[in-house]
Amino acid sequence: MKKQFNRMRQLANQTVGRAEKTEVLSEDLLQVEKRLELVKQVSHSTHKKLTACLQGQQGAEADKRSKKLPLTTLAQCLVEGSAILGDDTLLGKMLKLCGETEDKLAQELIHFELQVERDVIEPLFLLAEVEIPNIQKQRKHLAKLVLDMDSSRTRWQQTSKSSGLSSSLQPAGAKADALREEMEEAANRVEICRDQLSADMYSFVAKEIDYANYFQTLIEVQAEYHRKSLTLLQAVLPQIKAQQEAWVEKPSFGKPLEEHLMISGREIAFPIEACVTMLLECGMQEEGLFRVAPSASKLKKLKAALDCCVVDVQEYSADPHAIAGALKSYLRELPEPLMTFELYDEWIQASNIQEQDKRLQALWNACEKLPKANHNNIKYLIKFLSKLSEYQDVNKMTPSNMAIVLGPNLLWPQSEGNITEMMTTVSLQIVGIIEPIIQHADWFFPGEIEFNLTGSYGSPVHVNHNANYSSMPSPDMDPADRRQPEQARRPLSVATDNMMLEFYKKDGLRKIQSMGVRVMDTSWVARRGSSAGRKASCAPPSMQPPAPPSELAAPLPSPLPEQVPDSPATPAPALSPSGASLQPTPERPSVSKSKELSPGSGQKGSPGSIQGTPCPGTQLGPQPAASPSQLPADQSPHTLRKVSKKVAPIPPKVPFVQPGTVSDQPVGQPSPVSLSPTPPSTPSPYGLSYPPGYSMASGQLSPASAPPLASPSVFTSTLAKSRPTPKPRQRPTLPPPQPPSVSLSASSPQSTEHPMLDGMSPGESMSTDLVHFDVPSIHIELGSTLRLSPLEHARRHSATDKRDSEEESESTAL
């Protein structure tokens, strides 16, 4: 306590007074002392931040630290997710690999943190909290010793002064000696402490390089940790990529063809094969295939299903338009068209060649230059389109129509140009490329092809919903293939008009031709399958192209009133069972076309059914001739419509009459035919039924005027005299269905109203010659169905006429 008091008094004297003060440290040690404080501050803050960077629990063992590590928790979560999803899925495999990798990374992190904690954090802690504070503590202890020494010196000096003035020298001398010893002892302690402090300070300065190594060690440990982590990641990445590459269920829409084929190991793209195979099962007879737009939601769903290689064949077999839309969408979404950008100019140049043989050869050369993958797929697709064109009478998709709707999806320019140019010149050039390839598919790609390459598509039981709505059947069609009349109506919601005809009617084709662009043959205007083509058959005979030869000739009435001299009607013998014999006269043979009805063929695919109207004055049996005015009042004119028949040029016939009977058809009365045109694909299902194998002349027999036949079913009649000259007829008030550009001559008003014209195909014409002739013999076998009374016929057709009229009204409204 006394020592402490002396220190305080000495310190006060040194501070306030002018007492002697001994210097504790040298100038160099004072600089070291200042640096000690700075190093202590830096080491303390660094230790604190490094400790915060540790993810594990500091000071804990490796096992305990691992449980608290976030990476370990993540790894456990990934492994558990993999077990839930299963190893057979791609996502499950990815989770398992990533979980194992994260667990290894967690172990590396634990090792890294332990090493950092041992080699960096703990040494920094010792430096900041132990070594530097010890030096500072020695510095404070030295300061105390110096104060003690100064205090002892001061007291000894005071004692020495006072002893010189005192008379008793002995006691004063003893006290001074004691203080001198105390002073010397304090000086020794100060010297020892100063030496120790100086050594510690110099040692600190010398060890600064060691302190710097702590931070170097930190970087090295981090580098080693990241190096090991990178090694782990680099080792697992190839495994992850291999799993993804081995997984074949990858999106195919919008992906390069070669990439898709390489991943899936296929020769034909999956969407192409899937769509083609399903269309072969359910869409070959679908009307407007590739042209009718599918439901947007159905198309989106099917595209998504094709992307993941999962297709429900049973579901989409009922919607072939969605399948066709998906195929078109896949072709259009390819980054490069199936016929390639590289060969685009060559394709266009080939299409501009005028000579057909050279053009085909140029197209073949370009086709051979296609890459193997593209060549295989275009071959597969063209072979399918060629097969589809075999059903063009039913599906209305001719090679031209298919080229129109699919051409822009198979080839397009790399640089998008003017939209108008794209829609006119370029589009038609592309159509000119695709159409001949489809038409000559076996020449471009010889040999047969197996469409179902993978065998993974079933053959579901399918009912073609549009199969009941085909247009007029071909005469060559087998009777068993023809549908019943009630099944022969197509839905009005399906567009079936010929696309090129619509383009032609808008005058677009002629504009393009005027620009000097070569376009394919426009003979499509007169195609048999076109509804407008059938309407065009009402044009005057001079407007019709020559007709093809026929297998069997059947007489036709002349479309014009025949100018024959008045002569009394001569009796005609009754028809004998051997057939009707009609002898022609050698006067001005006509080139009028007539049609034959194939055995067993009927109205609109109904086996063994036919309708007919008699020519004015025509008679079968001993009944008077029927005029148009004698038709039942409630009978629809649609019952008089005919089916298409083959024709052959023969002289027109003169209707045979009952002895002493002439036609009582009034003046100006048109022939008994509907003045309201019916859509060609909506035929009337009514008519007389004949057993298969029976045939009639082209002149139609009105069901209402059919006589009851009680006589033998086969009889013969010979007509040797022409009919009397009829009076001029008035022109009908309702114009016939025909293109606007065609005008009818006033000299042939009846040609537009004759019942034969509604059933004629494009390319058929009728004669306008005025001749006298005898009708050749006609062999008719009448079955039991003709033995109905007129009253019974009228009752039958009265009920059906109302239903037909309602259907026509609905068709017209829609």
From Swiss-Prot:
Keyword hit for Flavoprotein: no
InterPro entries xrefs: AH/BAR_dom_sf, BAR_dom, RHG17/44/SH3BP1-like, Rho_GTPase_activation_prot, RhoGAP_dom
Matching SMART domains: BAR, RhoGAP
Keywords for the protein's UniProt record, in alphabetical order: Cell projection, Endosome, GTPase activation, Phosphoprotein, Synapse
Record's subcellular location: Cell projection, Dendritic spine; Recycling endosome; Presynapse; Cell projection, Dendrite
Residues with Phosphoserine modification: 493, 805
Coiled coil: none
Gene Ontology molecular function terms on file: GTPase activator activity; phospholipid binding; small GTPase binding
Annotated site, Arginine finger, chain positions: 291
Residue intervals of the Rho-GAP domain: 255-445
Region annotation Disordered: where it falls in the sequence: 467-493, 528-769, 784-814
Motif residue range(s): PDZ-binding: 811-814
Segments of skewed composition (Basic and acidic residues): 479-489, 790-805
Gene3D superfamilies to which the protein is assigned, alphabetical: Arfaptin homology (AH) domain/BAR domain, Rho GTPase activation protein
Free-text comment on this protein's domains from its UniProt entry: Rho-GAP domain is required to promote GRIA1 exocytosis from recycling endosomes. Rho-GAP and BAR domains are necessary for the control of long-term potentiation in hippocampal neurons. In dendrites, BAR domain mediates the recruitment to patches where plasma membrane is deformed by acto-myosin mediated contractile forces.
Subunit note: Interacts with BST2 (via cytoplasmic domain). Interacts (probably via PDZ-binding motif) with SHANK3 (via PDZ domain); the interaction takes place in dendritic spines and promotes GRIA1 exocytosis.
Cited function: GTPase-activating protein (GAP) that stimulates the GTPase activity of Rho-type GTPases. Thereby, controls Rho-type GTPases cycling between their active GTP-bound and inactive GDP-bound states. Acts as a GAP at least for CDC42 and RAC1. In neurons, is involved in dendritic spine formation and synaptic plasticity in a specific RAC1-GAP activity. Limits the initiation of exploratory dendritic filopodia. Recruited to actin-patches that seed filopodia, binds specifically to plasma membrane sections that are deformed inward by acto-myosin mediated contractile forces.
Descriptive protein name: Rho GTPase-activating protein 44
Organism: Mus musculus
Lineage: Eukaryota, Metazoa, Chordata, Craniata, Vertebrata
Gene name of this polypeptide: Arhgap44
